[in-house]
Amino acid sequence: MFNYTTTNLSAMPYAQAKVLHFEDGTIQLRSYATIVATIDREGWLSIHGLYSMTTRKHIGAFMREFTGMEYQTAKQIYTDGYQMNIHTGEVIPLC
């Protein structure tokens, strides 16, 4: 198991959401007890589910803070079954 540190979302410091920063550079968003988004060390963003309205707000805050993009981008890549590179904008099907 990788070691990681945990921080709050800047825009939602008291929310039931945590950002996990792994030693290898991977970043994950945990909303309540569920991992809902991952950015791997190469910049590939994957959204694992949209879940509740509150979790969607967490995803939106995560997107703005870590990608500079909005929730609608996360929703689109999730519903289309893609992952997106946050550095290049490249989009590929989920493996």
Regions found by a protein language model. Name each.
Residues M1-C95:
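Terminal leader/tail segments of proteins
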